[in-house]
Curated annotation (Swiss-Prot):
GO MF term (any one): proton-transporting ATP synthase activity, rotational mechanism
Pfam families (UniProt xref): ATP-synt_A
Function: Key component of the proton channel; it plays a direct role in the translocation of protons across the membrane.
Membrane topology note: Multi-pass membrane protein
Stored InterPro entries: ATP_syn_F0_a_bact/chloroplast, ATP_synth_F0_asu, ATP_synth_F0_asu_AS, F0_ATP_A_sf
UniProt keyword terms in alphabetical order: ATP synthesis, Cell inner membrane, Cell membrane, CF(0), Hydrogen ion transport, Ion transport, Membrane, Transmembrane, Transmembrane helix, Transport
Subunit structure: F-type ATPases have 2 components, CF(1) - the catalytic core - and CF(0) - the membrane proton channel. CF(1) has five subunits: alpha(3), beta(3), gamma(1), delta(1), epsilon(1). CF(0) has three main subunits: a(1), b(2) and c(9-12). The alpha and beta chains form an alternating ring which encloses part of the gamma chain. CF(1) is attached to CF(0) by a central stalk formed by the gamma and epsilon chains, while a peripheral stalk is formed by the delta and b chains.
PROSITE patterns: ATPASE_A
Source species of the chain: Acinetobacter baumannii (strain SDF)
UniProt-recorded name of the protein: ATP synthase subunit a
Taxonomy, superkingdom: Bacteria
CDD domains referenced in this protein's UniProt entry, alphabetically: ATP-synt_Fo_a_6
GO cellular component: plasma membrane; proton-transporting ATP synthase complex
Amino acid sequence: MAAEEHALTSPEYIKHHLTNMTYGKMPDGTWKLAETAEEAHSMGFTAIHLDSMGWSIGLGVIFCLLFWIVARAANAGVPTKFQSAIEMIIEFVDSSVRDTFHGKSRLIAPLALTIFVWIFLMNLMDLIPVDWIPQVAAFVGANAFGMDPHHVYFKIVPSTDPNITLGMSLSVFVLILFYSIREKGVGGFVGELALNPFNPSNPVAKALLIPVNLILELVTFLARPISLALRLFGNMYAGELIFILIALLPFWIQWALSVPWAIFHILVITLQAFIFMMLTIVYLSMASEKH
C-alpha cells in the first residue's frame, strides 16, 4: 500500500490521504483544483470538496435507486432476501420513530430512514482499502490530465469531511426551528427559551433571570447541530486515520491488524448512523412538544 508511493514520507502520505480534492477561487482570482493543502486553504469560502460532494450525492442516488427498485418489485408473495433486508431496515426505523417521536408528522419516518441509510452508506466507504480508489484517481489524473499524481487528492469517505456532517446537522437544525415555531408559535418558542430552566413565581425574579435563561438555552440549542456534526465527523475521521496508519506498516502486519479493526469498525459505522438518526428524532420530538 504505502510502500508503493516511494516519493512520499509517512507524514506526507498521511497528509495526502486526509486532504480533499478541492476546487475553488485562488487569491489572484483564478479558479482551479488545489495542488496542495495550502492552496486549498487559501481558497477560503469558495473551496468546494469535489470528492465529498460527489460521493455523498452518488451514494444518495444509489440509496434512492435501491429502495425504488425494491418498492417496484414488492409483492405479496415470497420476498427476495434483499427485499427482506430492506423491509427489516424500514421496520426498524419506523419502530424507532414510533417509540421516540410523539408528535404528528408524516415527514419524520422518511427523514429518519434517509438519514440512517445515507450516513451508513457514507460510513461504509471507510471499509474500502485506503489506497485503492485514490491510486486509480492518481493514475487517471496523471495519464488523462497530465497532473502530478502526488497532487491528486481523492477522499472517499464523505462523513470524514466536517463540511458534509455540518451540512447535514444544519439541515436538521432548520427542521428543529420549523417544528418549534409551527407547534408553539414565535412567542411560545421565545418564551420557552426565556423562561427555562429557571422560572420562579416571583415576577421580579422571573424578569431578572430571563437573560440567564436565554444564555443557557441558546447555548444548549445551538450546541445541538454542532455536537451532531462533530460526533459523526470525529468518530469516522479517527477510524479512517487508524486505517491509514495501518497502511504504513509492513504488508504482513497490515492484514493482521486491518481485518480485526475492520470488523470492529462495522459496529462503529452502524452505531454512528443510528446515533445521528436517533438524536434527530429526539430533537424533533422535543421541538414538537407543546408546553
